[in-house]
From Swiss-Prot:
Its EC number is 1.4.3.23. This is Flavin-dependent L-tryptophan oxidase VioA. It comes from Chromobacterium violaceum (strain ATCC 12472 / DSM 30191 / JCM 1249 / CCUG 213 / NBRC 12614 / NCIMB 9131 / NCTC 9757 / MK). Substrate binds at R64, H163, Y309. Changing V363Q: Retains 17% of wild-type activity.
Amino acid sequence: MKHSSDICIVGAGISGLTCASHLLDSPACRGLSLRIFDMQQEAGGRIRSKMLDGKASIELGAGRYSPQLHPHFQSAMQHYSQKSEVYPFTQLKFKSHVQQKLKRAMNELSPRLKEHGKESFLQFVSRYQGHDSAVGMIRSMGYDALFLPDISAEMAYDIVGKHPEIQSVTDNDANQWFAAETGFAGLIQGIKAKVKAAGARFSLGYRLLSVRTDGDGYLLQLAGDDGWKLEHRTRHLILAIPPSAMAGLNVDFPEAWSGARYGSLPLFKGFLTYGEPWWLDYKLDDQVLIVDNPLRKIYFKGDKYLFFYTDSEMANYWRGCVAEGEDGYLEQIRTHLASALGIVRERIPQPLAHVHKYWAHGVEFCRDSDIDHPSALSHRDSGIIACSDAYTEHCGWMEGGLLSAREASRLLLQRIAA
């Protein structure tokens, strides 16, 4: 099957949809056809809202934002009349011995960044605290990505200050945090409805297999979920997909785009709801615990549900538990919850319902922090444009997706005008 468009965007996450919105708002695109493809059956990308047990909205993907750190995202929420609620997990009320000393240790090490800030965070902390102490200190922050050799001490301080649970460690308590009252999927639906009303056509459930130049445009080969093959010709092309997806295409990524190196981290989120909110007996409502066991970060949302959130090795650990069977997975959660709370396992009931999500490439980022990286890329020969939060200083956040989309659409509008 063959069809064509003037403009094609591959990727219907927040970046791709925002690109479409910017383009359709411009007089330069008036009268031009626009087609959006995505491998998923629903738009949204890493925004994945879901109802848990028919009672509470949860986020299997992106789950929070800060107006101070993410002003463009806040503006989008307001523009599409999306209601926000306070994200309560911004303080560690219950701290381990190491966590009690964490803020002081980080403050004492901060002046050393000028001299050794380019070292890996583990190497940097080990230099002054010793290896064993450094490992314990970094583990107490709950984000195992901080152990990566690509994460410099300078980057680590920035990361810590931009995550709600541990922002106070670097004196960033003033940052407010919010979630969407009924899920960020509402924002996605709002943007999608706007671009659809403006004439964009969606083809969801199609995976991009390859792309090549074809005269003054591009020829895309795609495959549907049912194996149906599709050939699409377009004059202008934006790939609103992450680096891990770019690397699987025949577009010479990243060599012909930026020359930078990219990496990714797996993420795992598990949500559970119970007949009774048993954690209220321990005064844990709206509290987060960072623990030294495979659960890593445990969040107790009011009297509604609890969830845990892990990255790196522990994300893969939980994926393995799920693969071995649901009963074993739930028993592992129960065991580690009891250990974290210092209670016997029998005090923790079986959940009424649960849901989980493993993201093989949950966070993607540029591994070369010392280069001046554009927020959207253009292929040096073919001119294909690419956008992703991974190309911005807000990698892993929805804000980065919006910034990259803005730059990608600017590049294309500039090209159309010429």
